[in-house]
Amino acid sequence: MASTNVTGQCPGPMKATSNGAFQNESPLDFALPLIILQIVLVVVFTRLLAYFLKPLKQPRVIAEIIGGILLGPSALGRSKAYLDTIFPKKSLTVLDTLANIGLLFFLFLVGLELDFAAIKKTGKKSLLIAIAGISLPFIVGVGTSFVLSATISKGVDQLPFIVFMGVALSITAFPVLARILAELKLLTTDIGRMAMSAAGVNDVAAWILLALAIALSGDGTSPLVSVWVLLCGTGFVIFAVVAIKPLLAYMARRCPEGEPVKELYVCVTLTVVLAASFVTDTIGIHALFGAFVVGIVAPKEGPFCRILTEKIEDLVSGLLLPLYFAASGLKTDVTTIRGAQSWGLLVLVILTTCFGKIVGTVGSSMLCKVPFREAVTLGFLMNTKGLVELIVLNIGKDRKVLNDQAFAILVLMALFTTFITTPIVMLIYKPARKGAPYKHRTIQRKDHDSELRILACFHSTRNIPTLINLIESSRGTGKKGRLCVYAMHLMELSERSSAIAMVHKARNNGLPIWNKIERSTDQMVIAFEAYQHLRAVAVRPMTAISGLSSIHEDICTSAHQKRVAMILLPFHKHQRMDGAMESIGHRFHEVNQRVLQRAPCSVGILVDRGLGGTSQVVASEVAYKVVIPFFGGLDDREALAYGMKMVEHPGITLTVYKFVAARGTLKRFEKSEHDEKEKKEKETDEEFVRELMNDPRGNESLAYEERVVESKDDIIATLKSMSKCNLFVVGRNAAVASLVKSTDCPELGPVGRLLSSSEFSTTASVLVVQGYDPAADTRPLVEEDAEYDQSSRDISDLTA
């Protein structure tokens, strides 16, 4: 394992625990309380930096690198009292050991993310870009190494120094690049897919080159030592494929979906990771390679991989990994870069790094007929550095290939090149969100036989049964393809590696879709695919991976580009066993509100109380009673239009109750132009109801009644008399005063708030509908272009 170089007299070992301050013993003189203080300081400091850098859309690794440098001798460490108290030399062995243990398991997770099956399928274009993006920077790095070795790195072994410099300048940080692309919403664009594919190839090549560099940097006097190290390393990889891979696959097969993974299997896997690290450290390659190789050969399918990730990553990424950045920062002394020569060398290293990576990537991209602006953007994206860069540099310093000055220069180079990536890409590449204009933005339409497209969003498997049963109830009858559904899984983009793995698996259909890792076993995919095969409905599963503060942009953009008539959203509360509504998070509440403001079509919010029970209902068993309280207005008309679509299904019984209220019960408008507006609204409502009564779809399954009410209590009593139905479909902005005191869910409107409240005793689900109003200022997220080439004109083409 890597350890911090200590000069001078070797400090004595520290005892683990103290007897306490009351016995005149300082806790900072003992290993356990001191490492606890160091962990708390590092985590709090780096998290605060990450918070302040978040508006700049910088990945967290930037904050962790800067935090490590500031905690080291470059800033706070300039105070000898601070270093001797918080990071004394005698504590650095414990700090380094704990940091490297965290790094071991983190690289195991990185190996889990890399799927060689996907890398094998990398297109020739991405492969060429990756090769050029590695080769030219490596060559430039070799040239730069001669300049450094002639100035600030005199006396080092030339061959290892050349290889380390080449690797350091040619690396692309795969996880960091994924984070940047996600923040910029470029993951599912052509440039994002090319960048991720090329970065995957680059990552594998970087580890192979690093293994070579470590082998060459050994202390052995005979050149045969390096050969033996490489041969033994190759033998270990073969052993991992032949022995470790089948063992892990055996345990994965014995972990079926929906059942907990045995603790024994998790324990065995973690032990294998540590044992492999011990073997590779004994060989002389480095302990990190053992963990990384085990991660690569581990099975990627099924719940076993997911459970391992969930059990490891929070502790490792949140607590232990920042210690590695702190340990690296303690070795980074920026003050060693002084004088015109040193600063000139820093500029030289930065320029040569950017030149090699950008020119190599741009040149190969142009050969692949990538437009120049996209090629330059790709070049800057591929110039991203990260944790792997720090690992290379720390190994080089520990093996005395890099001295303090060269190490500091290369750390600052990695920090600078990563920091500039986001602002430069935002400056030079602003992909226009274009879409073809379309007319069917509502359920209301004259041509009832035209194709109806719905974007159905959900958070988890909890939303699936009711969502599928609602779709089944809405498909009507007739020719195949009349109803087309895009089922979008809303997934919050987090720092978790499982989210990054999904990012890596985004395929090339122009929109985010399912992660293939879970495709064979994921219950959500199985449910929608089974429904598609059984019904005359085309279903396209998708996944929106984004921060919850901006995921509404993905929803609205996808809705426009797929030309849907309605977006279905799950309510942010679900019903508990006792009937009370429980929130799944306020941020999902805000997502729904933002979609209502920016949607390019109608929107429905589904309050799920178990439509059809907790499982999917077959078509022959659909028997739902649907009730629509009609007060008037655009949203009520859209709700009624949706009900008329549902009544086409032979298992649906629809009852429409038109409320006729005395003066003062309904919303009253101001005089002047608002009186005229109210009059027009009433005329439109009456005309719409007349058309409803004459609609040929309104057979014996449709009933219409008028209810006269004189007060709010009358309305509530009438609604309660309808509570034995299966589904309420209501307009959001119904022309009625508030029916409940609570104002915490304005997105449901006055009627929806009452029907979804815990005080309203019913088992019926509620669909709250907001009709698309072309006159409203929705600040569209998509620029309409009549000449826009819609790549997916028919959903049936995508699901064939």
UniProtKB/Swiss-Prot annotation:
Keywords: Antiport, Ion transport, Membrane, Potassium, Potassium transport, Transmembrane, Transmembrane helix, Transport. One of its GO terms (molecular function) is antiporter activity. Residues 776-800 are annotated as: Disordered. Expressed in the whole plant but preferentially in pollen. Residues 790-800 have a biased composition (Basic and acidic residues). The chain crosses the membrane at residues 30-50, 60-77, 92-112, 127-147, 158-178, 196-216, 224-244, 278-298, 315-335, 343-363, 375-395, 408-428. May operate as a cation/H(+) antiporter. It is a multi-pass membrane protein. It comes from Arabidopsis thaliana (Mouse-ear cress). It holds the Pfam family Na_H_Exchanger. Its main location: membrane. GO terms for biological process: potassium ion transport; proton transmembrane transport; regulation of pH. This is Cation/H(+) antiporter 19. InterPro entries: Cation/H_exchanger_TM, CPA2_transporter, Na+/solute_symporter_sf. It comes from the Eukaryota. Belongs to the monovalent cation:proton antiporter 2 (CPA2) transporter (TC 2.A.37) family. CHX (TC 2.A.37.4) subfamily. GO terms for cellular component: late endosome; membrane. It is found in: Membrane.
